[in-house]
Design a protein with these regions (language model features):
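Glycine-rich loop(s) and the adjacent beta-strand/alpha-helix scaffold that form part
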Residues: 25, 29, 36-51, 239, ...
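A conserved FAD-binding loop/helix module that cradles the flavin
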Residues: 519-538
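N-terminal Rossmann-like FAD-binding beta1-loop-alpha1 element of flavoenzymes
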Residues: 7-32
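Conserved N-terminal glycine-rich FAD pyrophosphate-binding loop of Rossmann-like flavoproteins
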Residues: 37-63, 99-108
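Residue-level detector of alpha-helix initiation sites
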Residues: 9, 13-14, 18, 172, ...
Length: 548
């Protein structure tokens, strides 16, 4: 008896959603497994409550899932430490709590929809750092375009990212804050350009445009943000070939006698009922921490050290962003709490400059009022000092006048930055906890030292009145874009999957999340690249399964 599904997809985020979309539209019956719930924006998102900016909307992987060894900080790095949110520490501390739910990280992402520039695919060849990809920008460009059309991306063409067609929607108008930063950039001989965003700037595909409430991180109640649950999975569900199973934790990948993937073992619901699901194709898209965790836990006589781990590469080369976010006060209130979160960015430094001490590319972005500082309540709790009348006066004076510049650089891949299982420390589902080892290096510090004065230079040229503080990956990594732990490459000696996200060792197993990225894209957000890769991988799997 044949299984009821042709393909199983684990993880309903960016990569899993696009894989499910492509597979169902190709005629395959797909089971999409998600450990979190399906959210109802009207019921579950907090934007209608007065305290909406003070809490967290989405379920998270529990803190006891991961163990991270802190890293002592250098005594001479005080100027790089976090000063906002009253965070003071003598060591680097991590919190790898990922959002769980249908939509994955796109539930709370800020909508950035970036292509990686062509040079990001050839970092080793061009600049002698990082790794080269097993595919080129030109090969991925058609898939970028298709995903942009599906999501209704709003943007403006830029020479760094060659394209053969315009964006589906025009860019969002610059906020008053970004207009000030754009004027400052012009004074410096630089250009602040509109950000490309998976947030609708006009009605598109039956969905309304953005209302500029700036609540993207807490879930979009309007439906203009193109999260996977809103813009992608409904298209797959219309085929009648998609089954979504929520509240399901995958514990093992199962192999048949030939060494091919035949299914998964799952614990379903609060009662943790064990079930086995089978299919002829398997896509893992649980993220750069959970996907290698699942692979390492799926030991067998063929793979005694973990599935696909013949060469000890699963879980290695973990990358996180190197970032500095500087908060400033303008002399007047500019409604910085309104608009899309990051509506403009400076791309002058996306091309690396090894001779100038910057082997990684980076971007500077106009953030306005960042998450956690977007309402009077959250702002009052975090930034202005003082008590009583003085505190109230400072909140009244500075709220809406505060704006952030974000410097975002990629971290170079290093094999020693890795994760491994703690077999003697199971979590609530019996899956071993994960130990994460990531070191902040001299290269990372050089990038911070480079970005801080550039942020201040732009702020000064734009007329800011004062600096309010900063948040920094020097001591407070936010782990927004972890990637690289199941990296793609040419062969099994130095990679786990090929350029189609197909595993070298198990040919009917694909990985379609950020874990496959060999590098981070020189300061660009990864979700659009993950989605383009997933679309390409799914079409390859369909063709390969038909003998094409």
């Amino acid at each position: 008896m044949s299984p009821p599904y042709d393909a199983i997809v684990v993880g309903a985020g960016a990569g899993g959603g696009l894989a499910s979309y492509a597979l169902t539209r190709a005629g395959l019956r797909v089971l999409l497994i998600e450990r979190g719930p399906a959210y109802d924006p009207a019921r579950d998102y907090p934007i209608g409550r007065p305290d909406w900016d003070l809490g967290d909307t989405f379920a998270r992987s529990t803190p006891d899932t991961y163990v991270v060894e802190p890293q002592p900080l250098a005594a001479d790095g005080a100027h790089l430490r976090t000063t906002l949110y009253r965070h003071q520490t003598t060591q680097r501390e991590y919190s790898y709590q990922r959002a769980c739910g249908v939509g994955g990280s796109t539930l709370h992402f800020l909508g950035e929809a970036h292509r990686f520039p062509p040079h990001a695919f050839r970092m080793r060849r061009l600049y002698g750092v990082g790794r080269d990809w097993p595919l080129t920008y030109e090969e991925l460009a058609p898939y970028y375009g298709r995903v942009e059309r599906l999501l209704g991306v709003a943007g403006q063409a830029h020479p760094l990212f060659p394209r053969t067609e315009p964006f589906p929607n025009p860019p969002h108008p610059l906020s008053p804050v970004s207009q000030r930063f754009a004027a400052g950039a012009r004074r410096l001989g630089r250009t602040l350009v509109p950000n490309s965003l998976a947030i609708l700037s006009r009605p598109y595909a039956g969905r309304p445009p953005c209302v500029y409430c700036k609540a993207c991180y807490h879930g979009c109640v309007v439906g203009d943000k193109s999260s996977v649950d809103v813009a992608v999975l409904p298209e797959a569900q219309r085929t009648g070939r998609l089954t979504v199973a929520t509240g399901s934790v995958v514990t093992h990948v199962l192999l048949d006698r030939r060494g091919e993937a035949e299914g998964i073992r799952v614990l379903e619901g609060a009662d943790k009922v064990e079930r086995i699901h089978r299919a002829r194709l398997l896509f893992l898209a649980a993220g750069a921490i959970e996907t290698p965790r699942l692979l390492l836990n799926s030991r067998s006589p063929r793979f005694p050290h973990g599935l696909l781990n013949d060469h000890g590469l699963v879980g290695t080369h973990l990358m996180e962003n190197v970032y500095i976010a500087r908060l400033y006060y303008f002399p007047e209130r500019l409604a910085s709490h309104r608009g899309v979160p990051i509506d403009a960015h400076l791309l002058d430094f996306v091309t690396p400059s090894p001779a100038g001490g910057c082997p990684q590319g980076f971007s500077l972005s106009s953030y306005g009022a960042p998450d956690g500082l977007k309402t009077p309540a959250s702002f009052a709790l975090s930034v202005p000092r003082g008590h009583g009348r003085l505190h109230r006066e400072r909140v009244a004076r500075h709220f809406g006048a505060h704006a952030m510049i974000l410097g975002l650089a990629e971290q170079l891949p290093r094999q020693e930055n890795r994760l491994h299982l703690l077999d003697d420390q199971p979590d609530a589902h019996g899956v071993p906890r994960v130990a994460i080892e990531v070191r902040f290096t001299a290269d990372d510090r050089r990038m911070l030292e480079r970005m801080v004065p550039l942020c201040d230079e732009l702020a000064t040229a734009s007329g800011v009145a004062a600096t309010a503080g900063q948040v920094s990956s020097y001591d407070l990594p936010n782990n927004t874009h972890p990637c690289g732990t199941v990296a793609m490459g040419v062969g099994p000696e130095d990679s786990v999957v090929n350029g189609f996200c197909q595993s070298h060792a198990v040919r009917n197993l694909y990985v379609t999340d950020a874990s496959v990225l060999p590098t981070q894209g020189c300061g660009m957000a990864p979700s659009l690249t993950v989605e383009a890769l997933a679309l390409r991988a799914a079409e390859h799997a369909v063709s390969a399964s038909k003998g094409g």
